[in-house]
Design a protein with these regions (language model features):
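N-terminal ligand-binding/catalytic initiation module
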Residues: 1-151
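Active-site nucleophile and cofactor-binding loops and adjacent substrate-binding regions
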Residues: 156-158
């Protein structure tokens, strides 16, 4: 098989490897009122009282962020964040296919350690974990260290 040719065809045909789907019914007014407003206010208030309830009342417990800056993509090197997106989508697809983990790609347009750390930290409340992917050394280790100090969720780098 010509993997380069077939992969390009697959990516063009499917226009991405992952998607977001609803887990709750959205068929009628009552469904929508439970999933969104006004019903959604009650889970919000419970989480406000105890932030850890976000793991019980939302999908956060099963959501992982897969992050790159595009600086060390597989054997391709520094190809930029947009060009790294197919790899991040692929990693997210692996998380779902083999671990049933909902993973989301984040391709950051910065090579600055503190900008990357701050960006991830600011959105970390939406995720149960962070996977640092294809960020060049030694910055990847510094980013991992700083995030572990700042965030209260698992941070790993492979």
């Amino acid at each position: 098989m010509d993997y380069a040719k077939e992969s390009l065809r697959l990516h063009g045909e499917w226009k991405g490897k992952i998607e977001v789907v609803t887990r709750v019914p959205a068929e009628n007014k009552d469904d929508l009122s439970l999933a969104y407003t006004p019903g959604v206010a009650q889970p919000c208030l419970e989480i406000q009282k105890d932030v850890n309830k976000s793991y019980d009342l939302t999908r956060r417990w099963n959501m992982c962020l897969v992050v790159t800056d595009g600086s060390a993509i597989l054997g391709l090197g520094n190809i930029g964040p947009e060009a790294g997106m197919p790899v991040m989508e692929g990693k997210c697809a692996l998380f779902k296919a083999f671990g049933d983990v909902d993973a989301f790609p984040l391709c950051i347009k910065s090579n600055d350690v503190d900008e990357i750390v701050n960006t991830i930290y600011l959105i970390s409340g939406s995720f149960g974990g962070v996977n640092l992917e294809d960020i060049s050394a030694p910055r990847c280790f510094e980013i991992e260290k700083k995030l572990k100090e700042k965030c209260d969720i698992p941070i790993f780098h492979d």
